[in-house]
Amino acid sequence: MNFNKLQQISMNFKKKQKAFTLVEVLIAVSILTIGILSGFILITKVLYNTAVIQDRLTASFLEQEGIELTRQVRDSNFLQIMDGESVEWNNRLEDGSYTIESKAGSEQSVTLVSVDPGEAPNFFYDNDTKIYNYNTTGEPTTFNREIKITTINDDEIRVESIMKWKTRTIDFNLTIEDHLFNWLKF
């Protein structure tokens, strides 16, 4: 009788042990699944943030280029004045909104085109030259740049470079401001 009782206790223990092992497997699978999903979520967020950072960096370079090209127009005016030409220091820098683009090798290397405020066209990206431009020969991008010029007084203008772009489904914008002066007092 004792033997049967021991055998029954042993069988009950084995049954409990199998159920306990199944619970362990379920917990292990759950932990593994959570770990893998967390890894995928982390990778997805890293890839998204990388795209956002890359686009923000591109936008900041294009934005700075807009300010520098506007400064180049002012400096070209100074050079023309020094050569005896009759132009104002702020020639081609009238109040308004513009797109601005540099064309290497052309006689007038910087082109300002008037646009309605907030309506600047998107850039195209030329894979061969690695240059953003307004020509339709490259790939369309979501970047657009508006240069807003405001006269402060006879010797000062405010230049705002306003970048707008979209990364995936989120709209971004970035604005920098600079002041250009008639520092040569022409």
Task: Give the predicted meaning of each segment.
Residues 1-20:
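N-terminal leader/signal peptides at the extreme start of proteins
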Residues 4-5, 14, 33-34, 43-44, ...:
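Short secondary-structure boundary micro-motifs
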Residues 4-6, 40, 49, 53, ...:
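Short amphipathic alpha-helical leader/targeting segments
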Residues 10-11, 57, 67:
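Intrinsic structural disorder/low-complexity segments
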Residues 20-64, 77:
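Aliphatic-rich helix starts adjacent to a transmembrane/signal segment
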Residues 61, 67-186:
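Low-complexity, Gly/Pro-rich coil/beta segments used as flexible assembly/activation regions
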